[in-house]
Curated annotation (Swiss-Prot):
Organism: Marchantia polymorpha (Common liverwort)
Subcellular location: Mitochondrion
Highest taxon, organism lineage: Eukaryota
Protein name per the record: Uncharacterized mitochondrial protein ymf11
InterPro entries assigned to the protein according to its UniProt record, in alphabetical order: DNA/RNA_pol_sf, Domain_X, GrpII_Intron_Splice-Mob/Def, RT_dom
Bias kind Basic and acidic residues: ranges: 170-179
Reverse transcriptase domain location: 176-524
């Protein structure tokens, strides 16, 4: 047979694409060696593991190779192949089918075997991501493969396991794929072997080369570990905490794809495209006209989650015992490691509290009735009397007396209109009820019992919150500790959240002038007045309306936080913070500016943003000025502002020049010291928001009716494309 025809026939039988050819002499040991045969590397069309094909006399034998092709490292699609790898296509399919209530996912454990998923998880936790404090250190592809194999096939524990229930490979006790247990080598042999490996050129082992996005100078020596007994050296760049974080990120990426389409839109905690701001915007949109508010928070729900309840809920959506067993092992690690918001813990808790969302939505479908709020008869009669007085004489135009709180408390609303609104961010939830007080108390009892009995969680109270004295027609909305002399009027159906000494009870309340609901660092209040002019039939009227919701900054909470950091006292009076005493001016000013910008960014939805940011800027600037007054012995903060300016951008005190000989000896240190900006002239960071006009107006827009995560970004992209098209047409 002609050689050209022979090769064409072989290429036609390949699945999709020929990647590389090798002779039999370079074949691995696990592949059968046949005389006069050629081995090819190819990719399967379904994204199966890479395989070698042996052709001889028209017969074909398969031998799966455990090393990856180099093309996977570049994250680029191959010619003649669909974009994306097997795990991305599988996750897309899961995303489409997970919206069905009866859908159960299978084969999730196979996704963990794909090394590309581990590389993607490492890239997300690598330097430059948002999780700066929770990322693995420099590593290599070999380290990721070893870690993946230890998760899929845990090695036997020698000398005790880790605290997380797993035993990672340690030294010569590591069992590599297709290799036998190796004994300890002598120190001389080990050092000689490492020296030989480090002398190899960079392209000697292409299967252990990191992509450019993962390569760093610090770990360049760790890239050439290819021996089966040197897996511990490949993992030396990863600590035990780093391994746990990386494994949790891989599991989280799979679970997030499975549960994100299933979660309700009322949940905003630890979900992509959602935050505290989206939760507060939904409150501004849906809670208008709400009479009664119920606020709750579960007690340490990151650490007190019930494992049996969690696994039972996950079995409703997952039909893969191997994957569930792996998740069950990771629960212990997730609940022990790190603070809130790290690892897979928040997602697991969202899975549990999703049942609370479904329960409240069922109550909403039962209770809701009446599309539009009927007019309050008492309010309508009062407005009729006021209109008659205005028409009768001009003496009553200035002020018309009304009964106190007749409009604010919503008394006398018809019983035909009832409605429930609900939002949740992580473990904080807020329920708004439109209807009688008995309905609100009934809903409170049902929700609390569901949390304690079905989810096996406990509601908690803020111990720093002072008791509130109840008055007639004014009921507190949040949960407050109450003593025997502070209960106010007797409330029926009051029950205890937690037993034991110091019993704590729950109550419901509506917003009044002096009572506001703290939620996510904001204060939810009702607009007292909204005044505007109306001209009708040639006459001018001054209209005042109330009832809308407004979000305010919880200034006392922010001031208490600043007092803990040493910037002021509990009353908000600035004081010198000697933690910044030894730092140069540029660093201190940049740090204060970062704190102030962060507070302004978080409270950009508050109606009182400009007033509160102005006060916070005064506290932080004055605190730093008093620190510099003590440091440079200027006496008062006014003298510091006179030299440094309102924003403290000018150098307060120039550094004295060194002697010529000392400058030559310590030239590098002096240059580095000036580079940090200590007393050097030139550009220096400045504290923002020194004037009221520099603060931007708050964002008071609520969420749109059919809002979806990422909608704002898509709108910006569409506007950008439209602008570019218009420019192109104009140029043409």
């Amino acid at each position: 047979m002609d050689n050209q025809l022979f090769f064409k026939s072989i290429i036609a039988t390949l699945p999709k694409r020929i990647h590389k050819c090798q002779t039999v002499s370079k074949a691995p040991e696990n592949c059968a060696k046949m005389p006069k045969s050629i081995q090819f590397r190819g990719f399967s069309g379904t994204g199966e593991p890479f395989r070698r094909l042996d052709f001889r006399m028209g017969q074909r034998a398969f031998s799966y190779e455990r090393q990856r092709p180099l093309a996977f490292l570049s994250f680029s699609s191959l010619p003649g192949r669909r974009e994306g790898s097997a795990w991305t296509e599988r996750l897309r399919a899961l995303w489409k089918h997970c919206k069905k209530d009866q859908f159960k996912a299978e084969g999730l454990f196979r996704l963990i075997k794909d090394i590309n998923l581990w590389i993607a998880a490492y890239k997300k936790l690598s330097p430059g991501s948002k999780n700066d404090g929770e990322r693995p250190k420099g590593t290599s592809i070999k380290a990721l493969e070893t870690l993946r194999d230890s998760v899929i096939n845990p090695p036997p524990t020698l000398g005790g396991g880790s605290s997380t229930g797993r035993s990672w490979p340690k030294g010569h006790e590591t069992l590599e794929r297709g290799s036998k247990a190796l004994g300890p080598e002598s120190p001389k042999e080990t050092s000689l072997a490492l020296q030989k490996k480090r002398r190899r050129p960079e392209m000697a082992s292409p299967h252990t080369i990191l992509p450019r996005v993962l390569r760093t100078h610090k770990v360049s020596r760790a890239l050439w570990v290819v021996g089966p007994s040197d897996a511990s050296l490949a993992l030396r760049g990863l600590t035990q905490k780093d391994k746990d974080i990386l494994v949790q990120e891989v599991i989280r990426s799979i679970l997030e794809t499975l549960y994100e389409p299933y979660f309700l839109s009322c949940s905003h905690g630890f979900r992509p495209g959602r935050s505290q701001h989206t939760c507060l915007k939904q409150i501004r949109r849906d809670f208008v006209g709400t009479v009664w508010f119920i606020e709750g928070e579960t007690s340490q729900y990151f650490n007190k989650i019930d494992k049996q309840v969690l696994i039972g809920l996950m079995r409703r959506r997952i039909r893969d015992n191997r994957f569930l067993n792996l998740v069950q092992k990771e629960i212990k690690t997730s609940l022990r490691a790190g603070a809130e918001g790290t690892g897979v813990g928040p997602l697991l808790c969202n899975i549990v509290l999703h049942e609370l969302d479904l329960f409240v939505m069922r109550l909403k479908r039962i209770v809701d009735r009446g599309r539009r709020r009927a007019v309050n008869p008492e309010s309508k009669e009062l407005w009729r009397q006021s209109a008659a007085l205005i028409d009768r004489t001009t003496a009553h135009r200035a002020r018309v007396p009304f009964p106190s709180g007749a409009f604010g408390r919503g008394l006398g609303h018809p019983q035909e209109t009832r409605q429930i609104n609900y939002v949740r961010f992580a473990d904080d939830f807020l329920i708004g009820v439109i209807g009688p007080r008995a309905l609100a108390e009934r809903i409170r009892g049902l929700v609390t019992r569901f949390i304690e009995v079905r989810l096996k969680l406990r509601l908690t109270l803020d111990k720093t919150r002072k008791p509130i004295q109840s008055r007639p027609n004014t009921l507190p909305a949040h949960y407050v500790p109450m003593g025997p002399k502070e209960t106010g009027p007797k409330v029926e159906n009051d029950f205890t959240i937690s037993g034991g000494p110091g019993k704590k009870k729950t109550q419901i309340f509506c917003i009044t002038k002096n009572k506001k609901i703290p939620f996510l660092g904001y204060l939810i209040s009702r607009d007292s007045k909204h005044t505007y002019n109306l001209v009708r039939r040639g006459r001018r009227y001054r209209i005042r309306r109330s009832g809308g919701l407004s979000l305010l900054v919880d200034m006392q909470k922010v001031i208490n936080r600043l007092a803990e950091k040493g910037f002021c006292d509990k009353s908000g009076h600035p004081k010198p913070n000697f933690a910044y005493f030894q730092y140069p001016q540029s660093y201190s000013v940049a740090r204060i500016a970062s704190i102030l910008r962060g507070l302004a960014n978080y409270y950009h939805l508050a109606n009182s943003k400009r007033q509160c940011v102005t006060r916070l800027s005064y506290i932080l600037r004055t605190s730093l000025a008093k620190t510099y007054a003590a440091k440079f012995k200027l006496g008062t903060a006014a003298k510091v502002f006179a030299k440094g300016g309102r924003d403290l951008s000018k150098p307060i005190k120039a550094k004295k020049a060194r002697r010529p000989l000392l400058n030559r000896v310590l030239g590098s240190k002096t240059t580095a010291h000036r580079r940090r900006g200590a007393g050097s002239e030139g550009h220096s960071p400045a504290i923002p928001y020194t004037r009221y006009g520099q603060i931007k107006l708050p964002d008071t827009k609520p969420l749109t009716k059919n809002w979806q995560p990422g909608q704002a970004r898509l709108n910006c992209i569409a506007k950008k494309n439209l602008y570019q098209n218009c420019n192109r047409e104009g140029n043409d």
